[in-house]
Amino acid sequence: MIDNWSATPADAAAHFARRLAVETDVSDVAAALDSGFPGFVLLDSRGADAWAQGHVPGAVHLPGREIAARADDELDRSVPVVTYCWGPGCNGATRAALALSLVGFRVREMIGGFEYWAREGLPVETTEGVRSPVPDPLTVSCGC
């Protein structure tokens, strides 16, 4: 129910600023990758079967369960990390971001995950190469 507007504008601003400090979205990640100099490494935290089914081209595969054991060997602490998992119904990217932050990495979560990446018709890489799926008609550029 939306009848208790107890957050002050300052509290709301602080809340949303905190979210934007640790989240990014599919469109912003795609634009950064397209620039050729994204300033971060994109990390797919899903398991091997999901990775093989399709992933964002250029992403690093590091399943969430293996972050504690492998992050230092596979990632550069001086480069921020953006994590993703399947999609909004999965908190794997959140868990991966938490695990990375606990061991000293600067990290953000890509909200929407791989599901929204693919639904927006962005390039997907598999063992057969890179393809761009047909965009879901329910997704459009929000222009924000």
Placement of each model-derived feature along the sequence:
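Short, flexible helix/strand-to-coil boundary loops that buttress conserved ligand/catalytic motifs
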Residues: H55, A71, G121
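Short secondary-structure capping/turn micro-motifs that flank functional sites
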Residues: A68, Y116-W117, P133-V134
